């Protein structure tokens, strides 16, 4: 079920700075709700034409994802607010509670494992509600052409933070479709071939157990 959509700050111009921050904050909470999995990036003097080119490449490589420049301090607090609000029966955050004083007080007490990343000029790359190693691989391949402009700081994946090294390892995990295809291939193999595979696996297990036995 799709969660309710909040008013987006980008679609409304408000002169009052506090109201603008409030709209932006709500917009970020909604963005996190739509994509709780995202990469955290630091951008360095990225020119408008470079940003446009980067977005075009990412859109082609990872359809459905989005690169968005953020205001780090506001997004950071929005993430804490998102984590502090109890979910509705459909798994969504109650957007009516986002700007309540009680919610903000509760959010201030929350500690995140990526608290130290929200420094400097930042952007996020959304990965959607379901974590996809394939999407991360697509992003990493595009990132190679912007090494001096975009720095990968980490990832927020399934409510946990990971550093760039862990992101690299995560990107190497085979997709679910690949695993399903491999399993189907094995199951559809001739019985004799399947037996050889099982015998080989059994031999490997036996060898491993022998190696682990304490020497007399």
UniProtKB/Swiss-Prot annotation:
Top-level taxon in the UniProt lineage: Eukaryota
Self-association state and partner proteins as the record states: Component of the mitochondrial large ribosomal subunit (mt-LSU). Mature yeast 74S mitochondrial ribosomes consist of a small (37S) and a large (54S) subunit. The 37S small subunit contains a 15S ribosomal RNA (15S mt-rRNA) and at least 32 different proteins. The 54S large subunit contains a 21S rRNA (21S mt-rRNA) and at least 45 different proteins.
The keyword Transit peptide belongs to this UniProt entry's keyword annotation: yes
Protein keywords: Mitochondrion, Ribonucleoprotein, Ribosomal protein, Transit peptide
InterPro entries: Ribosomal_uL10-like_sf (IPR043141), Ribosomal_uL10_bac_type (IPR047865)
Entry's localization field: Mitochondrion
Functional description taken from the UniProt entry: Component of the mitochondrial ribosome (mitoribosome), a dedicated translation machinery responsible for the synthesis of mitochondrial genome-encoded proteins, including at least some of the essential transmembrane subunits of the mitochondrial respiratory chain. The mitoribosomes are attached to the mitochondrial inner membrane and translation products are cotranslationally integrated into the membrane.
Main location: mitochondrion
Name of encoding gene: mrp11
Transit peptide: 1-9
Species this protein is from: Schizosaccharomyces pombe (strain 972 / ATCC 24843) (Fission yeast)
Gene Ontology CC terms: mitochondrial large ribosomal subunit; mitochondrion
Entry's Gene Ontology BP terms: mitochondrial translation; translation
The keyword Ribosomal protein is annotated on this UniProt entry: yes
Protein name per Swiss-Prot or TrEMBL: Large ribosomal subunit protein uL10m
GO molecular function, one term: structural constituent of ribosome
Sequence similarity: Belongs to the universal ribosomal protein uL10 family.
């Amino acid at each position: 079920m799709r969660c309710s959509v909040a008013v987006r700050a980008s679609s409304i111009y408000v002169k009052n700075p506090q109201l603008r921050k409030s709209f932006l904050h709500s917009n970020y909470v909604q963005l996190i709700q739509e994509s709780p999995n995202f990469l955290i990036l630091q951008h360095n003097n990225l020119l408008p034409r470079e940003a446009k080119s980067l977005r075009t490449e990412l859109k082609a490589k990872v359809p459905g994802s989005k690169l968005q420049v953020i205001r780090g301090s506001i997004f950071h607090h929005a993430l804490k607010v998102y984590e502090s609000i109890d979910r509705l029966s459909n798994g969504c955050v109650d957007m009516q509670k986002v700007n309540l004083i009680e919610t903000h007080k509760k959010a201030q007490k929350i500690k995140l494992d990526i608290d130290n990343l929200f420094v400097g000029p930042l952007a996020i790359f959304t990965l959607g509600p379901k974590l996809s190693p394939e999407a991360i691989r697509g992003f990493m391949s595009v990132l190679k052409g912007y090494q001096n402009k975009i720095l990968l700081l980490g990832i927020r994946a399934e409510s946990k933070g990971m550093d760039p090294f862990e992101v690299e390892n995560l990107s190497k995990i085979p997709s679910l479709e690949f695993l399903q295809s491999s399993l189907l291939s094995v199951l559809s193999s001739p019985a004799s071939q399947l037996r050889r595979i099982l015998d080989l696996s059994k031999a490997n297990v036996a060898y491993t157990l022998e190696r682990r036995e304490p020497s007399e």
